[in-house]
Amino acid sequence: MGAMQQGLDGKLAWVTGGGTGIGRATAAWLGRAGATVAISGRRVEELEKTAAELRAQGLRIEVAPADVADAASVAAAHATISGRHGPVSVLVCAAGTNVPNRSWSKLTPEGFAKVIQINLVGVANAVHAVLPGMRAAGGGSICIVSSLAGWTYKDFPGVAYSSSKTALDPLVQSLNDEEGRHGVRVCHFCPGEVATPILRTRPVPPSDEEIARMLRPEDVADAIGYVVSAPSHVCLAEVVIAPTWNRFYIGGEDLKRRA
């Protein structure tokens, strides 16, 4: 941890999508920084497995199952963890999804709605849950895992995914506008390609060689950790992190050729 960073001892962190990928790696980072970490997701077995593995490393991990698309489910999970540990100091929204059929010619209304509900509405549900406690505590850190697809348009992530991630930018800006006066700072965190399970939803699965070029979840977790452990007067409002070999720069032409 750099000289600029502050520890998370005694704080409660909540990671949605915490069972796998970026969420899991971030939960581990936060736990090593001293936080008690609650992880949420829909797949309870996956959450319990992750929690057991991280507890074996000496980390304080709570399992709080929740479907981020369901506001009542999110509120119930938040009530459980805050009832045990007090207000959430750090929220990382890492739950996300995509669908294989991504172009207008193949995408269904149901597929579009599913992606929007999880990637956008799910973030709003989690933020709604934690804001009152953060205001009362005099501050907090929220990191919303978006995507490079929400920072610059390319067609290969698909219209539903790109729309859901692009909408997170004004969501974050509005939060910093309204909640910064209460000590709450929010980051629109935009990673490029990361080797996570969401790759399985691609119409053209990446090769092992392509996956080897991507960011690792731990790379992203390190950057998220830097964001949420910055001094309280510092707001990193947007972070873009990408692999050196960046498919967004080549326009996904390799995917189009193979599709």
Feature locations, PLM:
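Active-site-adjacent segment of SDR/Rossmann-fold oxidoreductases
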Residues: T152, S174-V184
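C-terminal helical subdomain
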Residues: R181-V184, H188-F189, D208-I250, D254
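Substrate-binding pocket helix/loop in short-chain dehydrogenase/reductase
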Residues: R102-W104, T108-A113
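Residue(s) in the substrate-gating loop at a strand-loop-helix junction
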Residues: S147
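Active-site helix of classical SDR
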Residues: V127, S164
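Conserved glycine-rich cofactor-binding loop
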Residues: L12, G19-G21
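The beta1-alpha1 cofactor-binding region of Rossmann-like NAD(H)/NADP(H)-dependent oxidoreductases
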Residues: P65-A77, P109
